[in-house]
Structure formats: structure tokens, C-alpha cells
Design a protein with these regions (language model features):
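Extracellular/periplasmic carbohydrate-active domains that bind, remodel
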Residues: 1-461
Length: 461
């Protein structure tokens, strides 16, 4: 159910934060959870607290024997994603969980959306031999903005906290790896977004982001812009302010996103092609992107897996597969979809594949495909959307969400969405055989197929 009393506030012109608002003196200054405590393999782990979630980073190279103590009474316990098949043993206030391999999952009590525990397990990443910048365990580092150069390898050891943002511009062969934390809270007011990206690489080649946690950034969290050959692996990305996108793949090519946990207060994984900070060089095609094996929580607003709104160049040959969308919360505006394509500009969007995606809760929309004019539009002539493929998309529980496909029409222009293919769409185990089963609304669209049969064609007037 939507909790309007806890709505996030969007500041379209946030107060400028020109310098870090505070200096952390110790890792102990980060707020700790009073609701949860966690041990793994007999060792107590630090559980951090925010006003939107609690989280614990669990690093080990063995099997994981977890004891999660919940210090407040509750009636209903849920572990997500359900596809992991995690079966807890509950004794008193302690939840016992055994994992043979690292998993990233949530512990939720009584349907609470602002007090869940994120349990983020990973294998330990050792210090690379070629590390050029090292942040050590148990220490806090106030970097303001850490600017990388070519061939930099940043190592953030488990237990280290880096306070600030990380930027790279026209760099080759850069890496940020480790099991530590980058915290961006110093760059925004407590309840406001800010006009600054968190981890931002522009026109870089060969970029690796692996293992670390990025939490509470000032706006978009991980932004490869006009980059080539990017791997984002085993990251934990968590935001709590509006415009807190998870990953914005902007005008980049040959990108892989895998094994990540993303809880975002805007689009979780997003594809864009647009000018960034008025820089026209960041407009180019997006292609050869593969997103797989991620756990996604899309808090209001935004969408879970989004293409748009700014799609100013060609977007093609993208694959999204084997992901769990554990929450897609109600937005009530233009977003709120588990899977969306929003074309507000002129780029041609085609050959996009979605496969084996499980949706546990979609409060507003499942699919939302539109060509439109909106506040984000910069190119008036609109690009086409066609050859879009959905296969084995499962809604596992909750209400059955609506889906929408809509083209664009003015007195001088018509752009129809066409050749969209749905196969093996299921709601609570029941396969959709008709557009009515899918709760699908189409306008200005044609050649829409469900299980190989055309369910929407263009009428001749």
C-alpha cells in the first residue's frame, strides 16, 4: 500500500552544495541499526542504518552461516528474492540462514518498505598488485572529489569508508575494487538531491567497478558516460533521496552489469543518450549492453529497468536477463514500471531483449512503452521503438499490474510503436494468452505479438 505520509521530496533546483557539508572523523560516526544485529560464521558484522533501510556487508570466502537478530516484534517475515529459495530457521528473535555461496537478499518484516535489512554477501577481494590508491580497513577517508587518472586502480578494503565522490574524465584502464564503502552523504542535504553525480566516468575506456558499496549519493549513483568496455560487478548501490538513480548507462558501449544489488529512489538501471551538464559530446549510440543476475528494488519514483527518457541517439542490441525485481513501488506520475521504454527524443530504439525476469511486486505498471513529449524532451522529431522482445517475464505475487504501449501523434507527425513480442508472460504462475490477461492497453501501436500471435494491428481509416 502506498504510504503518502512518507513521500520523498523532489527539488528540481536543489540548493548548491559546493563543498562537502561535513567531515567524518571515524567509521564509528556512521549510524548503526538498533533493529537488527548480524553475525556470520560466529563473527559479529556491522549493521548500518538509514531512514530508508538498514544494511550489512558480509565478506567471507567460506559458506555463510548467518544469524540475524530482529530486536523489534513482528508477525510476518519475508526473504527476497524468493527465487533464491532461502529457507530461514527462526528461533526466538534470531533468524538462521545458511548459504553455500554469496547472495544479496532482503529481510522484510510486516511489509515494511523503510525498515528492511539488506544482507549483502560477497567473496573477499584482495588488494591488487597494481593498486595505485588504497583505503585501509577501519579508517575513514574524506576525499571530497577523488579524481582518477589513466591506469589508476583504487582498492577499498573491507571496513574502509570513503566519504565523497569519484570522477574520471578521458581515462583508460581504471578500476575501483574492494569490499569497502563509498558514502556520498556529504554532498547533499539530508532530505534533498544535489546537482552532482556520485561515481562518474566520462569518455573512459576499460572501466572496472567491483565489489564495493556505494550508498547515499547526491543524485545519479553510477554513471558511465560515453565510455567503452565497462564492467560493473558485485556492487551494492543504495540511494535514499530523489533522483538517486542506481546505474545510468549513458551513451556507452560494450557494458556489462552483473551480480549487483540496487535499491534506488529513481530509475534502478537506466539507459540514456543525452547531453550531461550541457556537454554535447555525451550524445552517442548505446549498444552491446548486457545486464544480468542483479537484484533490484525500485523505490518511488522512477522505474526498475528503464530506457529513457533522453534517448537522443540510436539504442540497440541490449540484453536484460536473469534479474529479480523484488519491489517496484507506486509512483503515480510518469514512471512506476518494472520494465519501461520512454522515448522523449529522436533516437531509434530497436532490438532490445528482456529474458527470465522475475517481478515480486509491481504496484503500478509491469510494461510501459511510450513515445512522448515531456519536460525532458530536447529533440522534437521522435524516434521509433520496434523489435522489442520479452520472454519469460514472471509476476510472482501482489496485484496484477497494468501494461501500456503508446505511440506519438501530432497534426504533422505520427510515430507508432511496432513489432513488440511477448512470450511466456505469467502472473502468479498463470500464462497470459490474451491482451486482456496481460492487462495491456495499446494506442498508436501495431504488430504486437503474444506467444507468436498478433494481438494488435494497424487499423486503416
Amino acid at each position: 500500500m502506498k504510504d503518502f505520509e512518507n513521500d520523498l521530496i523532489y527539488y528540481p533546483n536543489p540548493d548548491p552544495v559546493k563543498e562537502p557539508r561535513f567531515i567524518l572523523k571515524s567509521v564509528d560516526e556512521l549510524e548503526k541499526s538498533t533493529k537488527y544485529s548480524v553475525t556470520c560464521n560466529g563473527t559479529e558484522r556491522v549493521v548500518y542504518h538509514t531512514d530508508s533501510f538498514d544494511y550489512v556487508v558480509v565478506v567471507d570466502n567460506e559458506a555463510y552461516d548467518l544469524e540475524i537478530s530482529i530486536h523489534t516484534p513482528y508477525e510476518k517475515l519475508e526473504i527476497r528474492p524468493s527465487s533464491f529459495g532461502i529457507v530461514p530457521f527462526v528461533k526466538g528473535e534470531t533468524v538462521h540462514i545458511h548459504l553455500d555461496e554469496p547472495r544479496k537478499f532482503t529481510v522484510e518484516t510486516d511489509g515494511g518498505l523503510h525498515d528492511a535489512l539488506f544482507v549483502l554477501c560477497s567473496h573477499r577481494i584482495e588488494k591488487p598488485a597494481d593498486a595505485t590508491i588504497c583505503f585501509e580497513k577501519g579508517k575513514v577517508y574524506n576525499v571530497g572529489v577523488l579524481t582518477l587518472k589513466s591506469n589508476d586502480t583504487v582498492y577499498i578494503e573491507e571496513g574502509a569508508v570513503v566519504s565523497g565522490c569519484v570522477y574520471a574524465d578521458h581515462c583508460d584502464n581504471i578500476s575501483i575494487v574492494g569490499n569497502g564503502i563509498i558514502n556520498g552523504a556529504c554532498w547533499h542535504l539530508p532530505d534533498s538531491n544535489a546537482d552532482r553525480f556520485f561515481i562518474y566516468a566520462k569518455w573512459c575506456n576499460n572501466v572496472l567497478l567491483k565489489g564495493f558499496t556505494a550508498v547515499d549519493g547526491p543524485s545519479w549513483h553510477v554513471v558511465p558516460a560515453a565510455c567503452d568496455h565497462v564492467v560493473i560487478d558485485d556492487m551494492n548501490i543504495m540511494s535514499r533521496i530523489v533522483t538517486g538513480d542506481g546505474i545510468d548507462i549513458t551513451s556507452s558501449q560494450d557494458v556489462e552489469v552483473k551480480n549487483c544489488f540496487i535499491r534506488s529512489t529513481d530509475d534502478s538501471i537506466c539507459i540514456k543518450s543525452q547531453r550531461l551538464f550541457e556537454d554535447p559530446s555525451t550524445v552517442r549510440d548505446v549498444t552491446k549492453v548486457r545486464v544480468h543476475n542483479n537484484v533490484i528494488w525500485n523505490a518511488e519514483p522512477g522505474n526498475a529497468i528503464e530506457l529513457g527518457y533522453a534517448l537522443q541517439s540510436e539504442i540497440h542490441d541490449l540484453v536484460f536477463e536473469d534479474c529479480d525485481i523484488i519491489h517496484c513501488q507506486y509512483e503515480g506520475n510518469m514512471g512506476g514500471a518494472a520494465i519501461s521504454i520512454h522515448q522523449a527524443d529522436g533516437g531509434h530504439v530497436h532490438d532490445i531483449h528482456y529474458k527470465n525476469i522475475r517481478v515480486e511486486q509491481a504496484e503500478q505498471k509491469l510494461f510501459d512503452i511510450k513515445v512522448l513529449l515531456c519536460r525532458y524532451t530536447e529533440q522534437l522529431a521522435k524516434g521509433e521503438i520496434n523489435d522489442i522482445y520479452f520472454d519469460n517475464i514472471q509476476v510472482l505475487n501482489g496485484d496484477i499490474p497494468v501494461s501500456m504501449i503508446r505511440g506519438y501523434q501530432t497534426p504533422t507527425e505520427e510515430v507508432r510503436v511496432h513489432d513488440v513480442h511477448f512470450d511466456n508472460i505469467t502472473f502468479m504462475g498463470n500464462k497470459c494468452e490474451t491482451w486482456q490477461d496481460m492487462r495491456l492497453v495499446t494506442e498508436l501501436a501495431n504488430d504486437i505479438y503474444l506467444n507468436g500471435a498478433r494481438i494488435c494491428r494497424q487499423m486503416k481509416f
